[in-house]
A protein has these predicted regions:
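Metzincin-family zinc-dependent endopeptidase catalytic domain
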Residues: 1-102
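Active-site recognition of the HExxH zinc-binding catalytic motif
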Residues: 99-111
Length: 152
């Protein structure tokens, strides 16, 4: 459920993933700029990272325990002025801006960059690639098969 707007500075977002109430911290999506967030310098339009936990899950078949990383919270930072420029000046601006958000959201849940320029997870991006490619979808599918972590 969305919690609404916050004035919390991105630099002060805590690495703590559980609050006093035992709930996982919400994902923070920040519209910011390179002055406030230096990691958005040059042509970096966004970045994201998930807060990862290691959980142990027993195998349903042989009882062995596997250690798995799961993502429970995190942050997405988007360069508002650069996104506005994409929207205003690119013929395919809306699709390109949405592609940036998709790319960063995929990082949030655990996807990494790939070398294939036809995939949305390529770090260089392309005005021609505005949706997840087959490799992106395979990665998301694999992540979706992982274990869930309870609230408390």
């Amino acid at each position: 459920e969305p919690l609404g707007r916050t004035d919390t500075a991105l630099s002060t977002v805590s690495e703590t993933v559980k609050g006093a109430d035992g709930r996982w911290s919400p994902v923070v999506i920040a519209w910011t700029n390179p002055t406030a967030e230096p990691r958005l310098a040059d042509d970096v339009v966004g970045f994201a990272g998930g807060t990862r936990l290691e959980v142990q899950t027993p195998s349903a078949t042989d009882g062995t325990v596997q250690q798995t990383d799961v993502y429970v919270s995190g942050v997405i930072a988007l360069d508002g002025p650069q996104i506005a420029g994409i929207l205003d000046y690119s013929p395919n601006g809306r699709a390109e801006a949405v592609a940036v958000v998709k790319h960063e959201a995929a990082h949030l849940v655990g996807l990494d960059h790939v070398d294939d320029p036809s995939e949305i997870m390529n770090p260089r991006g392309s005005a021609l690639v505005t949706d997840f490619g087959p490799g992106d979808l395979r990665g998301l599918n694999q992540l979706g098969r992982g274990p869930c972590v309870p609230e408390a």
